[in-house]
């Protein structure tokens, strides 16, 4: 158990005692009869490659710019070692997708180790696991090749291996190595690949698509970093929306996320210029997203491109017959995902290593089509995609990318959902508390993105406001089916959006859990299947609540959006004991970051007297009482 920190002179011990003190204040009485059903997949994740959350983040490949991808290749992250220079070679393509390779020019009088280094994504996290590296090589050479992980400033070696390899000038050949490592104290580590300079003197060698992986989550090939995957698994989310987000849209039709260019061997994926200022390798592609869902037990929510690029980029929005090739492309993607091996695209999936179809039940058509000039044409575009997809796959749940009526068909198709996004101030989120009370119950809602914004790090005021917003939609989780905080992940060294749920650097174990992360974890891990009626002698504000049950277990979620302690009595007939989890700080501006961890949850066991729990909730607090 971690106690509260930095609480304006109130000791952690006295505060914890105050949580279970006898007090008389707001009375909450939970009905054990009846109730409304609550969505079993209410809490989950929205992911797109922003803030280097994919490349350089949860995706396990650690080398930056591994294949010199793109129409303007460069040597970012690469440097030469020893008596040699490196250059981009566009005349020695590895594949049609990787048209440029690194040419290593070795001096005539070279001796010792010569080769190249890669600095990773602002470092390489060497965690002490077994590492694996692969690379393609072309050129006349027969001799030793050494792969090392070495301190950038210290020269300390954290792992190495040497193999003997023979290559020719005619074709690329692939080499692969595995080697043990010792844990590095930080991320200031270089990947180094060298050959014997005395053997290769005066020659040149080409290297193509180099990779470096440590241990991956559940040992999945081309998989996720376990440190970040474990943090997500701790949240016990239920779904994953991918691949975006703005990064699905792209800046034009040509620049959109193309599913068929994210599958197969890494060196057959050209990558693309992402919409968040950096190139995406697409090593984290369609297969990897579905394996992510399998390995973390998540329901996949697939976003598909719908004829609209970010801010009406290129010649978008497309309408009428211009949509036909893109509708066909989505149908091909769905056949790839859902078709058996007798179908053209199902057979292609099997050839790429996935024999059985994936379990896809939900598809979202577009992203935020209410913005950037997309609204006026969205009803037409949504209908065109909906009709084609529904005709081919009538069991799929199809989700519109907005909930704004002006952008939607006059009558939504039966069974379709809408997507509601809300980035706001703390007061703005609290003001949305009862928004979902008055929804049309015939159209289910997906809250695809929400959070407090316009701040560097989530703080207590914002996180409590998010909890109020979450209590509001959980009270209505008969119609609000799913909700996801966004953005999810943030490499501290390269950030395009703040605040974010989880921060990290490349130092092993350097993961920063925000106050908002703990709110998400507390709410997601304590879920009932039925929302219970709660009667009170007080109105909502500054205290907010929702109660649910699953069998004999009851969950009361509370948020105190104010500077005063709230004394509570919570009555749940038939219960006798409970676990009280509280996240609080008397300073509404308190936050966790890469330099400080001020606020973490505290847990205590509480006893009921005749089914009634009595405790106090501190200022700026979020709490969950799990009782049985």
Curated annotation (Swiss-Prot):
Q: Which InterPro entries match?
A: Alpha-L-AF_C (IPR010720), ASD1_cat (IPR055235), Glyco_hydro_b (IPR013780), Glycoside_hydrolase_SF (IPR017853), Glycosyl_Hydrolase_51 (IPR051563)
Q: What is any one of the record's Gene Ontology cellular component terms?
A: extracellular region
Q: What class of enzyme is it?
A: hydrolase
Glycan attachment points: 36, 51, 74, 152, 171, 260, 359, 440, 493, 610
Top-level taxon:
Eukaryota
Q: Where are the transmembrane segments?
A: none
Enzyme Commission code: 3.2.1.55
Pathway terms, separated by semicolons: Glycan metabolism; L-arabinan degradation
The record's family statement is:
Belongs to the glycosyl hydrolase 51 family.
What protein am I looking at?
Probable alpha-L-arabinofuranosidase A
Source organism per UniProt: Aspergillus niger (strain ATCC MYA-4892 / CBS 513.88 / FGSC A1513)
């Amino acid at each position: 158990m971690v106690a509260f920190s930095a609480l304006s002179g109130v000791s952690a011990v006295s505060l914890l005692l105050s949580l279970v003190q006898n007090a008389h204040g707001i009375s909450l009485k939970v009905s054990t009869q009846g109730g409304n059903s609550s969505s079993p997949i209410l809490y989950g994740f929205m992911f797109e490659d922003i803030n280097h959350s994919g490349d350089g983040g949860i995706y396990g490949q650690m080398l930056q710019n591994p294949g010199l991808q793109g129409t303007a290749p460069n040597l970012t992250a690469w440097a030469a070692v020893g008596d040699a220079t490196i250059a981009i070679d566009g005349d020695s393509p590895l594949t049609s997708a990787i048209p440029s390779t690194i040419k290593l020019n070795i001096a005539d009088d070279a001796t010792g180790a010569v080769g190249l280094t890669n600095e990773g994504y602002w470092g390489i996290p060497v965690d002490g696991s077994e590492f694996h590296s692969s690379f393609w090589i072309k050129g006349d050479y027969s001799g030793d090749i050494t792969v090392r992980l070495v301190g950038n400033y210290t020269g300390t070696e954290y792992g190495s291996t040497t193999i003997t390899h023979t290559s020719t000038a005619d074709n690329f050949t692939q080499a692969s190595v595995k080697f043990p490592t010792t844990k590095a104290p930080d991320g200031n580590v270089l990947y180094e690949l060298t050959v014997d300079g005395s053997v290769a003197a005066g020659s040149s060698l080409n290297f193509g698509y180099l990779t470096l992986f440590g241990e991956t989550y559940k040992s999945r090939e081309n998989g996720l970093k376990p440190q970040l995957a474990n943090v997500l698994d701790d949240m016990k989310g239920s779904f994953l929306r991918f691949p975006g987000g703005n990064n699905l849209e792209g800046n034009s039709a040509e620049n959109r996320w193309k599913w068929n260019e994210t599958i197969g061997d890494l060196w057959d994926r050209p990558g693309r210029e992402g919409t968040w200022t950096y190139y995406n390798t697409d090593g984290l592609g369609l297969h990897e997203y579905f394996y992510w869902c399998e390995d973390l037990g998540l329901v996949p929510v697939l976003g598909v491109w719908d004829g609209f690029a970010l801010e009406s980029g290129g010649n978008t929005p497309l309408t009428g017959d211009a949509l036909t090739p893109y509708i066909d492309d989505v149908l091909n993607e769905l056949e790839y995902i859902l078709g058996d091996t007798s179908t053209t695209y199902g057979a292609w999936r099997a050839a790429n290593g996935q024999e059985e179809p994936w379990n896809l039940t939900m598809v979202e058509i577009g992203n935020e089509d209410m913005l950037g000039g997309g609204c006026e044409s969205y009803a037409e575009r949504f209908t065109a995609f909906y009709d084609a997809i529904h005709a081919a796959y009538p069991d799929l749940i199809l989700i519109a990318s907005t909930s704004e009526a002006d952008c939607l068909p006059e009558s939504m198709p039966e069974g379709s959902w809408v997507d509601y996004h809300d980035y706001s101030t703390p007061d703005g989120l609290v003001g949305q508390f009862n928004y979902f009370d008055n929804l049309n119950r015939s159209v289910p809602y997906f809250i695809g993105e929400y959070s407090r914004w316009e701040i560097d790090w989530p703080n207590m005021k914002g996180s409590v406001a998010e909890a109020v917003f979450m209590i509001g939609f959980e009270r209505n989780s008969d119609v609000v089916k799913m909700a996801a905080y966004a953005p999810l992940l943030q490499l501290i060294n390269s950030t395009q959006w703040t605040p974010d749920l989880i921060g990290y650097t490349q130092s092993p174990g350097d993961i920063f859990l925000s106050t908002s992360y703990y709110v998400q974890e507390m709410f997601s891990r304590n879920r009932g299947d039925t929302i219970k009626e709660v009667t009170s002698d007080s109105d909502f504000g500054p205290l907010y609540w929702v109660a649910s049950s699953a069998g004999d277990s009851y969950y009361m979620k509370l948020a105190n959006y104010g500077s005063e302690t709230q004394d509570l009595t919570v009555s749940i007939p038939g219960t006798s004991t409970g676990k009280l989890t509280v996240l609080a700080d008397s300073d509404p501006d308190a936050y966790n970051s890469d330099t400080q961890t001020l606020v973490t949850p505290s847990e205590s066991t509480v006893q009921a007297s005749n089914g009634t729990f009595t405790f106090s909730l501190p200022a700026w607090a979020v709490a969950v009482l799990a009782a049985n």
